[in-house]
């Protein structure tokens, strides 16, 4: 099964997967415009307003928290997961993040044990890293996903991450240290 997302004349199909009672996109969001058609600006530095970030020669997209808070990033009928959505997924898979992970993972710190994952759920979390300091940081070592409380239009202080060093769910701070602006993470949407 797939969903079709059409924005500004561009069409993108995302495969979907059911895990427990939840329906998730099996790929990270790849939008360059909001659902209403407003262009989302490509950025290279954090702290310069809402935007997306894309390392050269890749199909990887990161979005800063400012873009997430603008709304309308998720395809119609879908949303950026809230803390309860992530908690329900965590409980259903018994905190075994390895069954969500796929691709070539590396450890965060030397001496850590590697967990490459089995992707038994078909969630397909790849270790794409995050965006910061004008570049892709920690590729092959982690992936961080946005969490959004749509009711309050707020982002929690920490969001979900998976690392090559752990079979468990992890968390990552959403703000850049000692700054008022947000980091740039991947977006994985869930059906409303």
Question: What would you call each of these model-derived segments?
Answer:
Residues 1-192:
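Conserved positions within compact, well-structured domain cores
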């Amino acid at each position: 099964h797939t969903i079709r997302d059409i924005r500004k004349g561009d069409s993108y199909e995302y495969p979907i997967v059911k895990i427990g009672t939840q329906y998730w996109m099996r790929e990270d969001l790849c939008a360059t415009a909001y659902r209403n058609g407003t262009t989302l600006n490509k950025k290279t530095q954090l702290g310069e307003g809402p935007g997306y970030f894309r390392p050269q020669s890749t199909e990887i997209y990161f979005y800063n928290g400012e873009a997430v808070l603008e709304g309308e990033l998720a395809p119609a009928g879908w949303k950026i997961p809230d803390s309860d959505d992530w908690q329900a997924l965590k409980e259903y898979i018994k905190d075994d993040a390895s069954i969500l992970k796929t691709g070539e993972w590396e450890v965060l710190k030397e001496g850590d044990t590697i967990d490459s994952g089995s992707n038994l759920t078909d969630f397909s979390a790849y270790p794409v890293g995050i965006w910061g300091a004008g570049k892709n940081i920690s590729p092959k070592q982690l992936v961080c996903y946005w969490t959004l409380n749509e009711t309050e239009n707020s982002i929690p202080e920490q969001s979900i991450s998976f690392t090559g060093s752990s079979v468990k769910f992890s968390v990552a701070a959403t703000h850049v240290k000692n700054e008022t602006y947000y980091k740039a993470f991947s977006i994985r949407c869930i059906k409303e």
